[in-house]
């Protein structure tokens, strides 16, 4: 790939053209930034800015992934432990309880025994069903726009996690937009790049609205007015940037503000969700164990009496 770029440069092509010929190997934002800097003679500064930009966006992305995946991992571990107990621990007590015909066995114990028996019979079908569901879900998410939009809408309206997604999207939008404007990329081109960069269909629609507004001679900010997915403070800062002619600077301030909110939201998730899930795991395992063990102690106490 790099040899082809070197060859393109020796044949008289510009650096941006050489990168563009590599297809999707290089992000569109990088290519357009370089294209603009070639006209202004600021290529070294632009490359330094891009290095910082991609480092910051990668850090934000990792924080976002951590916030969304960490609770899921803890929940999967909890379900795995519970399933293991049901499949390999509880069955060892079944024969004992079968000898207790007529004994007063608590309802919760009977429920645990019934659930254990159900899992032993159908665990393979349950696992196949889960895998099948995940495959169908991923296929629809990748290939059906309306389904993807619906899932993203649902996640963004979920307590706690919704704000994390919104803060992340606003941060990425503002940071990218500010960087494009600061390097003299045209607003319409900037919006088209933002559309390609974003993976959120709801924000893509906002960007499309902004492009249409620009074509009609309207301001960019009107596309973000009264939109639940775009916080009011961010909208007001865009309006201020348009009125003062300092839109790049204001977008940087928006990015910095919502990046801090995003970091705080991720920290809160780690702080509150972890103990809640640990308590859930403890309660689940405790209920299963006590429902099996306590009746046995009662039985032995009755025999000794």
Regions found by a protein language model. Name each.
Residues 36, 42-236, 240, 246-305:
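Low-polarity contexts
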Residues 7-10:
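Alpha-helical, low-charge segments enriched in small hydrophobic residues
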């Amino acid at each position: 790939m790099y040899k082809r770029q070197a060859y393109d440069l020796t044949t008289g092509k510009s650096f941006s053209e050489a990168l563009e010929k590599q297809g999707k190997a290089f992000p569109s934002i990088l290519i357009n930034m370089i294209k603009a800097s070639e006209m202004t003679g600021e290529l070294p500064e632009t490359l330094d800015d891009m290095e910082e930009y991609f480092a910051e966006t990668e850090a934000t992305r990792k924080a976002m992934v951590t916030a969304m995946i960490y609770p899921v991992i803890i929940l999967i571990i909890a379900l795995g432990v519970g399933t293991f107990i049901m499949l390999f621990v509880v069955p060892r007590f079944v024969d004992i309880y079968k000898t207790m015909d007529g004994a007063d066995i608590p309802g919760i114990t009977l429920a645990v025994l019934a659930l254990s028996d159900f899992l032993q019979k159908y665990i393979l079908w349950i696992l196949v069903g889960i895998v099948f569901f995940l495959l169908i879900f991923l296929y629809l998410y990748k290939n059906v726009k309306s389904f993807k939009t619906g899932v993203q809408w649902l996640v963004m309206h979920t307590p706690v996690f919704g704000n994390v997604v919104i803060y992340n999207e606003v941060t990425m939008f503002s940071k990218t937009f500010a960087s494009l404007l600061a390097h003299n990329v045209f607003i319409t081109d900037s919006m088209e790049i933002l559309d390609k960069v974003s993976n959120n269909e709801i924000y893509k629609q906002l960007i499309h609205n902004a492009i249409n507004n620009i074509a009609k001679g309207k301001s960019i900010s009107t596309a973000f007015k009264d939109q639940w997915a775009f916080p009011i403070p961010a909208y007001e800062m865009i309006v201020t940037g348009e009125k003062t002619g300092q839109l790049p600077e204001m977008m940087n301030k928006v990015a910095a503000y919502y990046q801090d909110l995003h970091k705080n939201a991720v920290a809160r998730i780690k702080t509150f969700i972890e103990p809640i899930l640990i308590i859930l795991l403890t309660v689940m395992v405790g209920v299963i164990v006590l429902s099996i063990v306590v009746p046995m102690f009662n039985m032995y106490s009755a025999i000794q009496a």
